C-alpha cells in the first residue's frame, strides 16, 4: 500500500503507463511492494533503493470523518526522496502527461516538484497533518484531491453545506490552484 502506490495501482487499472518514484529498503516489505508493482505493470525502474533501509510502513485508523484518528508508521525512508533525487528524475517527470504527488514527501521535495515540473502536478494531501506542508505551494499545483477536513485546513473555510463547500473551493482557487 501507501498513498502513492495505491494511486499508481489505480492508474494501471485504467491502463495508464505508470512509473512510481519511491524509496524502498532492503527488507521483506520492499520485496512485497516490488512484486505487487511488477504484477500490475507499475514501473519501479527509477525507484530509489536504500541499502539497509526499511520500506515505509503505515497502519491507519480513521475517525468518523475519514481523517486520521491514530496511526503507527515508519516513514523515515521518505526523507531520502530529496530534491536532488527528483532533480535526477526530472527528464522522466517532465516527459509524463502529469505528475501525481502525495504529501508523505518532505516539503522541500514537494516544493521542488511544483517548481520544476513542466507538466501538471496533482497532489493528494494524505492527511491534515501532511496537508500543512502544502501552505504556500498551491499556486503551482494543477489539481488537489483533498477530503473535507484537508480542504477546510487549506482553504480556511469550515465546510458545513454546499454553499460553504463552494466558498472553500473558491478560496483554494484564489490561491492559484487550477482544480
What kind of feature is each model-predicted range?
Residues 72, 98-100, 122, 145:
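Structural motif
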Residues 26-27, 103-107, 125-129:
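Short beta->alpha connector loops
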Residues 30, 107-111, 130-134:
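Short, well-ordered alpha-helical microsegments
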Residues 13-97:
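Conserved N-terminal subdomain of the carbohydrate kinase-like
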Residues 76-80, 107, 128-131, 153:
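Short, small-residue-enriched loops and turns at beta-alpha junctions
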Residues 116-121, 125-179:
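Conserved phosphate/ATP/ADP-binding segment of small-molecule kinases
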Residues 1-4:
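Short catalytic helix/loop segments, enriched in acidic residues and glycine
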